[in-house]
């Protein structure tokens, strides 16, 4: 599964971006919790979720300056 491109999320509204940020933070927390309790975790998802979160935060920051 390739990492998502920033072009895929640039057209989102501010509300959609906020919702996705909250959702991704929850997913990252859940992954960390699973890892801490030694449940089966696909470790590559950490990188993907953090990458998506960074993209969303960048888009959010850029839209605040416009």
Curated annotation (Swiss-Prot):
Keywords: Chloroplast, Plastid, Ribonucleoprotein, Ribosomal protein. SUPFAM superfamilies: Ribosomal protein L29 (L29p). Coiled coil: none annotated. InterPro entries: Ribosomal_protein_uL29, Ribosomal_uL29, Ribosomal_uL29_sf. GO terms for molecular function: structural constituent of ribosome. The keyword Coiled coil does not apply. Pfam families: Ribosomal_L29. One of its GO terms (cellular component) is chloroplast. Its main location: plastid. One of its GO terms (biological process) is translation. It is found in: Plastid, Chloroplast. It comes from the Eukaryota. Belongs to the universal ribosomal protein uL29 family. This is Large ribosomal subunit protein uL29c. It comes from Gracilaria tenuistipitata var. liui. The gene is rpl29.
